[in-house]
UniProtKB/Swiss-Prot annotation:
Gene3D superfamilies: YVTN repeat-like/Quinoprotein amine dehydrogenase. GO terms for cellular component: nucleolus; nucleus. Belongs to the NLE1/RSA4 family. Its main location: nucleus. It comes from Schizosaccharomyces pombe (strain 972 / ATCC 24843). This is Ribosome assembly protein 4. Residues 28-116 are annotated as: Ubiquitin-like (UBL) domain. Keywords: Nucleus, Repeat, Ribosome biogenesis, WD repeat. SMART domains: WD40 (SM00320). CDD domains: WD40. WD repeats lie at residues 132-172, 175-214, 218-264, 267-307, 344-383, 387-426, 429-468, 471-502. Disulfide bonds: none annotated. It is found in: Nucleus, Nucleolus.
Amino acid sequence: MATLLPPKSKRQKKESLNPTTIEIPEKFPLVNVQFRASDDSNELASLLVPGNSSVRQLEALLNQLLENSDDPVPYNFALHHEDETIEIQDNLYTSVFHNGLMKTEDHLTLLYTPQAVFRVRAVTRCTASMNGHDGTIISAQFSPSTSSRLVTGSGDFTARLWDCDTQTPIATMKGHTNWVSCVAWAPDASIIATGSMDNTIRFWDPKKGSPIGDALRRHTKPIMALCWQPLHLAPDSGPYLLASGSKDNTVRIWNVKLRTLLFTLSGHTAPITCVRWGGQNWIYSSSYDKTIRIWDAKDGKCLHILKGHAARVNHLSLSTEHVLRSGAYDHTDFKPKSFSDERRKAKERYEACLKQSGERLVSASDDLQLILWDPQKSTKPITKMHGHQKVVNHASFSPDGRCIATASFDSSVRLWDGKTGKFLATLRGHVAAVYQCAWSTDSRLLVSSSQDTTLKVWDVRSKKMKFDLPGHEDQVFAVDWSPDGQRVASGGADKAVRIWSH
């Protein structure tokens, strides 16, 4: 009797229609290609190239044409076809010809974009171990303007401000009466906010570490998340609006300068886990209640509720997050002459980022999955991303918005396409839960922190570990890569702040 095969599942049917591996023919006709800069600043003459050329081969050819061969620049390539931009993922054949998008006799105009106009060197060694905290370090963040200033929050009820150049503490910021759960620099680096399990938010001078004004006390349970208003949206008086998320199920919007509560955003039915303030003046909040809410920052009204997760949502990341965090500061060593000058530069950077990749949102959950959203266009997911075997603790868009890195309790880091959500790679090397990951400013490198006491630096292009960084004596909860690319900071249960450099 013949064996009857079970019917294909929906997933198997989908995979059969979209095979993950496509055989690329060794011989394929030459095609007519013209390279054009994505900003229309340069257009090269047409030439013939093999229709099965890989992205790396196109990159090498373009560098040769642009006379960059001595110091080659990595590029992304895209094809504009019928009012749609198709990114060249691996090679021309799979992206353009295999699916019949175009024919070999067609003329192809390939838009090229440098992945970054400067390069960040991988951190390779611990250059400082700074002691002072008497409790577990659970949060760490570099100043948006310089890698010489770092703030950390700890279970010893204090935050500390560090000088990373001299490897010494500047100040111990005392005032909280419970764990400091989150820290946040204003995007112009003019003020530091700290949130605590004592239900309060405090503010500090970033030069001396001295307190600024009284604590904000309207939350009734611990503060879990802080996020400043983006610099390009700030009024002439300065960047003084802050969003806070709490275990009391609310998000609150504050005028920090006046010490007034502007709005209480009520609607979540369980504790808030993460808050993001987008560049379109929308506020995004995630919660134990399995939902993400979108709020209008102008009036505090709930605009949308994003549903799709089956368990609590742990973390959110925006594709524009890097430029929102760093404001006007970039690789050009920009020195603003005034606040309006600073705000103008921040707006230019944001609009350039928005033009390149839009403003998408990714959410990470206890249900082992991620969801990619385009909230400005729809409340329905772009896609759901499966693969992690345990809780997904953290998600982070690369600065260029093209890639998403996720950290999970399954001991792995995964990479996903930032536009489609397509799975790209699993980065294995950690032997225990991975807590956080942080990108280099040029989007080429990634660092992850783990329960296994190590940091690991990954090369995103090769999808392999570049450096293993042991040194901590206990699990590492917090990691940050400075916006200028010079340093990585980490902290954890061994109470030490470690600085890593190249």
